[in-house]
From Swiss-Prot:
Key words of the record: Cytoplasm, Methyltransferase, rRNA processing, S-adenosyl-L-methionine, Transferase
EC number: 2.1.1.242
Biological function: Specifically methylates the guanosine in position 1516 of 16S rRNA.
PANTHER family: RIBOSOMAL RNA SMALL SUBUNIT METHYLTRANSFERASE J
Protein origin, superkingdom: Bacteria
This protein's name: Ribosomal RNA small subunit methyltransferase J
Subcellular location: Cytoplasm
Family matches, as Pfam families: SAM_MT
Length: 248
């Protein structure tokens, strides 16, 4: 995959070369999308829209740390959706990991979560965030035990991953109507990078074949059910819903 690769002052240019080789990235100085290694972290930037800022994964500080400390805990919708109960912490495969937010919330609550991400740039961002998280004194020990990344297509992972999880979680990209700054920024950058999840409908059947307990599909409230298959039950929030499917 071609993308502009930049090592900022203070960053390790050798590390950037190793990263490119690991994820199969080819540097294109003229590319609109840039993967930038700073002294602190790996960032994704849209060079023709610098006001959008940088996208990066940070499990230690910022929004994710705040959500871990002050969020709804087991009362969070995603926790309810995967079926977390007092003595039940499901093993989860998040087959459309993105920036890993929901996966991190579940891991912070005690679930083992295997994230799957097929796009090499997004996988590189996720891995960078994970490695920094693993090194953190506070969250590192449990993060290493509970949250891992597999760089593969969702279809391949759903067919081959072992052992099978209790829950398969799907959150395929869907055009957002909301105009919040965060959604706007991330969706614009992500859709420039990866496009729409045109093959998302094909994930439902293998997900149901893999999951031991349930498949959870996160959808905007206005989106049709995945693959046109009506959910067997659902959990609705203010702007989203979680569609539930039994194994098949």
């Amino acid at each position: 995959m071609s993308i502009c690769l930049i090592a900022e002052e203070g960053a390790d240019s050798g590390a950037l070369s190793s990263l490119a080789a690991r994820w199969g990235l080819v540097s294109d100085p003229d590319a609109v999308m840039a993967l930038v290694l700073t002294a602190e972290r790996l960032e994704l930037r849209k060079q023709d829209e610098p006001k959008l800022g940088a996208i990066f994964v940070d499990f230690v500080a910022g929004t994710m740390a705040h959500r871990r400390r002050f969020g709804g805990g087991r009362g969070e919708a995603v926790a309810k959706a995967v079926g977390i109960k007092k003595d039940y912490l499901p093993d989860v495969v998040d087959a459309t990991a993105g920036l890993g937010r929901d996966a991190f919330v579940l891991a912070a609550l005690g679930c083992r979560v295997r994230m799957v991400e097929r796009n090499p740039v997004v996988a590189a961002l996720l891995d960078d965030g994970l490695q920094r998280g693993y090194r953190d004194a506070e969250i590192g020990p449990w993060l290493q035990a509970r949250l891992t990344l597999l760089h593969a297509s969702s279809m391949t992972a759903l067919r081959d991953i072992t052992p099978p999880p209790d829950v398969v979680y799907l959150d395929p990209m869907f055009p957002h109507k909301q105009k919040s700054a965060l959604v706007k920024k991330e969706m614009r950058v992500f859709q420039s990078l990866v496009g729409a999840d045109d093959d998302a409908d094909a994930l439902l059947e293998p997900a149901r074949a893999l999951a031991k307990k349930r498949v959870v599909v996160k959808r905007p409230d206005y989106a049709p059910p995945l693959a046109g298959v009506p959910a067997q039950s659902m959990l609705e929030t203010k702007s989203h819903r979680f569609d539930f499917y039994l194994p098949a």
